[in-house]
Regions:
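Long lumenal/extracellular ectodomains of secretory and single-pass membrane proteins
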Residues: 1-504, 519-666
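Short basic/aromatic active-site micro-motif
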Residues: 507
Length: 666
């Protein structure tokens, strides 16, 4: 008896699609979940509340120091803000006796508004009406954090309309000022007399409150305000990138535009800004829209469909899944599907497609009796199996309708041309009319300068390309002889936005990370998989443009999750690769019910390429892996930041993500 085989069997489970998967250790599951969470938002397979509960449960299964290290890693390396605070709150609820929590809080809180965010998170997770029972370690950590910020930072994030304000936090944690100047600053917070900060929001708000005789006059005033902000040098990198469309629509002058381009493409400014790569893609997508729905319109469209047609489909989908789970209880899906294919009206036993049925021609009654006996042994009736078959057909129909629905609500900038029938369906005629008026004014201003929108926007697009290229500089360990395959998942679950405010979806992130890798590799094959695998070839120079081109091919390979098709293609072509990288949410299954699986295909491929390594880039963090992580040739990497490539380099040196996190000194 092989005990190793028994241990491997104990790791087996099923993913959300019902396919074979492997459990992760609590540390790995917590890591993959945390670095793929931006807030309490619903994922495709998991609600936001369920994910928070899962994180809270995992915090209690791992050692406290690792949780503190992971919170710091998520904040400093992955550039996440909300989920590190959740980790610290859950850690404070179950760990006491030392200063670990306070030290982690002091280091994790890096923006003034995170002080109040952490307190609101604690109040939410404690289900209390007030903060009177706040953990002493959280108090000490927040008291230290108060001393890290100046008046500008406090004034910028002093929001009086929040449930917990900076004044409330100050009265609660009682920080000790370092000197008289800081004591005066704390008094200003208490009295509400902080100086109004010089920010782009306050300047534009002041300009917008003036009275104008026409829309053109208003645009001129706002344009002048933007130009002053740019020349002042006090416009932040993120604010500049978020408002490129506004600057374009207002047609800022050439001098200001050149300053914006220089700032965006400056490698040092990119490094200090600590922007996630998909932020550059989001700005690039917005600039490439031309007389088409802008991201706000697309978000409104998506909400409409999800709240109406999409919600009805989802409710029916989950109800069918619930019924199928009840029927399948104790019976494997693959066997159930085989029984469903048995035709009642025929006497050919081999058509039954049922294991154990003898080959040959037998009376129908005899065949039915044998199958009925087998089903009874498994705890199912023939009626149950027929019902299961009917439900599966309904489920497949809903999946097709959901795929079509996602086509309408996904952010495909190159395909929103033509009549825009969905505008009338959604009822945003007034919005479209106002946008058209804004675009008409923009075109008029450009015409006066003898420019087209393409000529005006091209330098900004090039600046964004330069910026994102600098984020690829930390990708190490690849030379011209390294053979790499990059595969991106296009399944329906990848069309979920990373957050409610974002126009970027998981599908975009997978493509962008693959294009970043392509930029650094010379011997590379890129492609997408859904129902099948298809390769696409683009020049390696442009990252964002190539991502846009890949987005335009969405739907050509279908919306299934047949990740095994990537490896099967390598087997059929007998292509030897050094590294195979799959960017996915790890919810893979065989939509053809043919018994294929990524793990099985990889084992076969290893006979052709014994030295090949498989890298799974987990973009959603559902807690399972389609291949056993105990294999020495399979690696799991999670997250959306370019810092994931540091983990890739660490793997070459015998380390992994958990080892990197454990090296952090709290």
């Amino acid at each position: 008896m092989s005990y190793n085989k028994q241990l491997c069997y104990n790791d087996l489970t099923q993913n959300h699609e019902g396919a074979k998967a492997w459990r992760m250790s609590p540390e790995w599951e917590l890591y993959t979940t945390v670095v793929t969470t931006m807030g309490v938002e619903d994922k495709f397979y998991e609600s936001g509340q369920d994910r928070v509960k899962r994180i809270a449960s995992l915090v209690r299964k791992v050692d406290a120091e690792f949780v503190a290290q992971l919170a710091i890693y998520a904040r400093e390396e992955m550039q996440l803000r909300s989920v590190p605070l959740l980790l610290l709150v859950e850690l404070a609820k179950c760990h006491r006796g030392d200063s670990l929590v306070s030290r982690a809080v002091s280091r994790t809180v890096q923006r003034a508004d995170e002080i109040t965010e952490l307190l609101m998170c604690y109040q939410w997770r404690s289900s209390k009406k007030d903060l009177s029972g706040l953990s002493n370690q959280l108090r000490k950590g927040l008291a230290e954090a108060f001393c890290h910020f100046d008046e500008y930072q406090f004034a910028k994030y002093d929001r009086r309309n929040r449930k917990v304000t900076l004044r409330d936090a100050l009265l609660l944690v009682h920080p000790k000022p370092k000197d008289a100047a800081q004591a005066e600053l704390f008094r200003k917070i208490l009295n509400g007399t902080l100086d109004t900060p010089y920010t782009w929001e306050t300047e534009l708000s002041a300009a917008g409150k003036q009275k104008f005789s026409s829309a053109d006059e208003r645009d001129e005033a706002l344009c002048e305000t933007w130009q002053q902000l740019i020349r002042s040098g006090r416009l932040g990198y993120m604010a500049m990138m978020r408002n490129l469309v506004n600057m374009t629509n207002l047609c800022i002058d050439d001098e200001s535009k050149e300053m914006v381009c220089r700032r965006l493409s400056d490698p040092e400014a990119v490094r200090k800004s600590r922007q996630l790569p998909f932020r550059f893609l989001s700005a690039y997508l917005e600039l490439t829209y031309d007389r088409i729905p802008n991201p706000w319109f697309l978000r409104a469209s998506r909400n409409y469909w999800e709240d109406n047609a999409g919600k009805a489909l989802s409710d029916r989908y989950y109800e069918i899944e619930r019924q199928m789970t009840i029927i399948r209880n104790g019976y494997h899906h693959r066997h159930a599907s085989k029984v469903c294919r048995y035709p009642v009206r025929t006497a050919l036993a081999y058509n039954a497609n049922y294991r154990g049925t003898p080959i040959g021609i037998f009376p129908k009654r005899h065949i039915r009796r044998r199958i009925k006996q087998r089903l009874h042994k498994e705890g199912l009736s023939r009626k149950d199996m027929l019902k299961l078959q009917k439900l599966e057909k309904q489920l497949e129909n809903i999946r097709k309708r959901q795929s079509a629905l996602r086509t309408y609500i996904s952010k495909r900038p190159m395909r929103y041309d033509g009549a825009y029938w969905q505008r009338n369906e959604i009822g945003f005629q007034k919005l479209v009319k106002s946008r058209r008026a804004e675009w008409a004014r923009r075109d008029k201003r450009l015409a006066s300068r003898k420019l087209t929108k393409t000529e005006f926007v091209t330098p900004l697009l090039e600046a964004l390309e330069e910026a994102v290229r600098s984020t690829a500089d930390n990708i190490r360990g690849f030379d011209k002889n390294t053979r790499v395959l990059l595969a991106s998942d296009t399944s329906g679950s990848m069309f979920r936005p990373v957050s409610q405010q974002s126009a970027v979806i998981y599908y975009h992130i997978g493509l962008l990370l693959s294009m970043l890798m392509k930029f650094r590799c010379e011997n590379v094959v890129t492609g997408m998989f859904g129902d099948f695998w298809e390769t696409y070839d683009f020049p390696s120079d442009d990252i964002l443009y190539n991502t846009l081109e890949m987005i335009s091919h969405e739907g050509e390979v279908g919306y299934s999750t047949n990740g095994h098709a990537v490896i099967d293609w390598l087997i059929d072509e007998r292509r030897v690769m050094d590294k195979v990288m799959i960017f996915t949410d790890c919810e893979l299954w065989d939509s053809t019910n043919g018994g294929s699986h990524l793990s099985r295909s990889w084992s076969i491929y290893k006979r052709i390429a014994p030295d090949a390594k498989l890298y799974l880039f987990d973009l959603a963090g559902y807690g399972t892996s389609p291949v056993s992580m105990k294999r020495k040739d399979v690696f799991n990497i999670a997250g959306w930041s370019d810092k994931v490539f540091d983990i890739l380099y660490a793997l070459e040196n015998g380390e992994n993500a958990i080892d990197m996190i454990r090296r952090i000194v709290v």
